[in-house]
């Protein structure tokens, strides 16, 4: 039970940004052969400002299968050489279990009572399409924003396996590296926990609407994102994310979309960059490996650009 809960919470926490894009988590069948690992790693070396050893930034994708969960050899060398490993949030079982209450309702109501019969029926319909045995019964004590995210995660959860972030955390622990989160779960999820119930209901409705639309059109934005990640090209990853953001920004609930974008990406980029800068300043003699979702390293302003602005030299490592 603890292992299942840990995996579910890890997916919920680290895939929170997927709600921003309203992605349907239903990977398409792959006809072509896949590489063993990404063609290029999303890896950057940090130097300068008195650092005695280089440290590294690494972009992950929060899935649990395929070549994306195997480190590129260059990333493996950097990871093995580091003495400290950092994920977005602490991924040890105790920290994950302690964060579970963030996902639970505190208003004394059941989910169906809050969202109404029509939306509840749509949620159940989507769950049945994922697996005929699924329904919303386990969701009734969860927050509405959690119910908006979980349908997108369940296919990965049901496949089993560990997301790359968790695999690296466990490997770091087994290797005796120091481990920590760059954020606390409560801070990472504030984008959702600060939403009003009406906003959470809109998020759920728009998520289900997006899943249905992609299915009807035969699209799979998630697979597009995975494919882009495997190429190791930040521009391709940014293009997929930017398209999803544009679609949301042009939609009916533009203000809500803009608020989520700011909280999930812009604010968190700065928060994690500040943590990295403070860590490097405090421990310049050690090699640190900072892993966060790929979306935090693409675009005009991101974690890496914040470090450059702070005076560090940040260089892409491609092989």
For each of these PLM feature ranges, what is it?
Residues 26-31:
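Sec/Tat signal peptide C-region and signal peptidase I cleavage site
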Residues 34-35, 42-260:
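Structured, acidic catalytic/metal-binding patches in enzyme active sites
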